[in-house]
């Protein structure tokens, strides 16, 4: 098993079982924070939600391509929904918590906040500052 011994010495090597343990140790709130910081624009969504579809279409119409995390397709999606509901102050109502948008790693909020920012003209500067929009 020379390959196994050599691979174990490498700093980048992590066996699949260790990766699962590391992922399980990450709380839902930590996962939300990590995912929110991985792209300029991140949308936490439910695939059957019309408001989620509307916010995704808004960004695509502006030429912004957000990272979309469909919570209903994620095995840990329920936990993420609860963490997001706490973040946006939905009082534990997970259904009221989506879509949740992060721009530049910062919480913008749910659909009402995104649309308010779009209408009052503050959404485009946020997108430019995050590097999601160049024009």
From Swiss-Prot:
Query: Any signal peptide, and if so, which residues?
Result: none
Q: What PROSITE patterns would the database entry show?
A: GLUTAREDOXIN_2
Give the Gene3D superfamilies listed for this entry: Glutaredoxin (3.40.30.10)
Q: Which Pfam families match?
A: Glutaredoxin (PF00462)
GO cellular component: a single term: cytoplasm
Keyword Disulfide bond tagged:
yes
Any idea which UniProt keywords this protein has?
Cytoplasm, Disulfide bond, Electron transport, Nucleus, Redox-active center, Transport
- Locate the motif Responsive for interaction with TGA factors: 132-135
Domain Glutaredoxin as annotated: residue spans: 29-134
Subcellular location, record wording: Cytoplasm; Nucleus
Disulfide links within the chain? 49-52
What does the similarity note say?
Belongs to the glutaredoxin family. CC-type subfamily.
Function, please? Answer: Has a glutathione-disulfide oxidoreductase activity in the presence of NADPH and glutathione reductase. Reduces low molecular weight disulfides and proteins.
Q: What is this protein called?
A: Glutaredoxin-C5
Species of provenance: Oryza sativa subsp. japonica (Rice)
Task: State the organism's lineage.
Answer: Eukaryota, Viridiplantae, Streptophyta, Embryophyta, Tracheophyta
What gene does this protein come from? GRXC5
């Amino acid at each position: 098993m020379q390959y196994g011994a050599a691979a174990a010495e490498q700093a980048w090597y992590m066996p699949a079982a260790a990766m699962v343990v590391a992922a399980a140790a990450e709380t839902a709130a930590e996962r939300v924070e990590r995912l929110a910081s991985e792209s300029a624009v991140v949308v936490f969504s439910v695939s059957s939600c019309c408001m989620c579809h509307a916010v995704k279409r808004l960004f695509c119409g502006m030429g912004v391509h957000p990272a979309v995390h469909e919570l209903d397709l994620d095995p840990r999606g329920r936990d993420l929904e609860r963490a997001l509901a706490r973040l946006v102050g939905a009082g534990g109502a997970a259904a009221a918590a989506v879509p949740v948008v992060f721009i530049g790693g910062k919480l913008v909020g749910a659909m009402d906040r995104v649309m308010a920012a779009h209408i009052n003209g503050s959404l485009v500067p946020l997108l430019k500052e995050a590097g999601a929009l160049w024009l």
